[in-house]
Amino acid sequence: MIQSSPFPQPFSSPLAQPFGITPIQQPKPQQPREETMPRFVNYLADYSGCGHWRILWPEQVINMTQRGLSQSITAMIAEPRWYQGVKAVKLQRQASKAQLEFVKHLKKIQQEHDFKIIYEVDDVVFREEIPDYNKFKFAFDTDEVRESVVSIMDLCDEVTLTCDFMRKLFQSKLTNQKVTVIPNFVPYNWMGYLFNQKRVQTAFEKHKSKPRILYTGSGAHYDVANKTGGKDDMSAVNHIIRKTADKYKWVFVGAYPPPLQDLVKSGKLEFYPWRSLLEYPQFIANLDPQLMVAPLTQNNFNNSKSDIKFIEACTLGIPCLCQDMHTYSDAPDDLKFNTPEEFEEKIEWILNWKNRKRYFQNIRMLREIGVKRFLENPENIGSHMEALTTPYGSPERKYLKQWNP
């Protein structure tokens, strides 16, 4: 019998292995990496520019770099089990009474699953601060919406928005003082890859006899319904545009000032309807502008805006002449104006062919400003991650400190 054999049992020691090889130990099953990644849920208010800048683009980078699992939806889910394992729930610009009731329900679920609730907003939602010329004011112009939006924000653990002026304005309106700035960051794979220094220089030379000046913006910037007697974000400089229509080729994308309709019809001003978010960057680059402009009326609503126009221009290496206000506080002084007269003078100074050497030198400087605001930069996507995964005021927030000193 084998048991009584004087020889060792087969494979009872490493010395008796076939060919001297130890049997391979089967590894224990490993959890998929996704099982250990934080999960985030976003309730969107829109799938347009605001939704992409503030949630959908950051979500894409978070998912593609496996920093977490982020999911955006519009239908609000009341089932508590769905929130198991969720680290944060983000609410984008929710303002209705029904949405307030849902947030109250969400607070009850929060007690069981211990997730964070964040209110995300990129525009002022208080009706008393929205200019009458803004054609979208009606969406927030009732007592019910005003009360609901404040109540929702006060129920949240934190509010995130785009700039410091906006932060202070919201803190003056809310009981909830936990308000955090996360600027808008431009995705490299959306616009950043389009930079071409040689093209910018060649376009400047090509159009030196009649430089091209670009303004992009929706009808919300214009008094299209004549509610303010024509006073809007462009009214202060409309006469400069008319005056210089033969000297420069003014180009408008999205909408144009109603008082300048005759120049559009005659072809002196170029106008192009709004393009989809996917088409927009390439379309703007193909227009070959030598200068972009960003006039704004001084009010709390506009001071709370993000500097998107400036950052987009920098990303392409093109100068953008901005209104001298909080919105564009990071722009170089040479690219800011206060009065219509200064607007005209600085346009001449920037686009004068005699100053081409300085214009060419500034292309790279502007591009470097844009590069610092790429969404994919660790410190920028890191700001989004810190807001999602750490409590307000946490010492772990090293990236957010830059925007929230």
Descriptions of predicted regions:
Residues 127, 223-232, 278, 282-315, ...:
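Nucleotide-sugar-dependent
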Residues 108, 112, 139-159:
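Membrane-proximal helix-turn-helix segments that form the acceptor-binding/catalytic region
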Residues 198, 352-404:
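A charged, aromatic-enriched C-terminal amphipathic alpha-helix characteristic of glycosyltransferases
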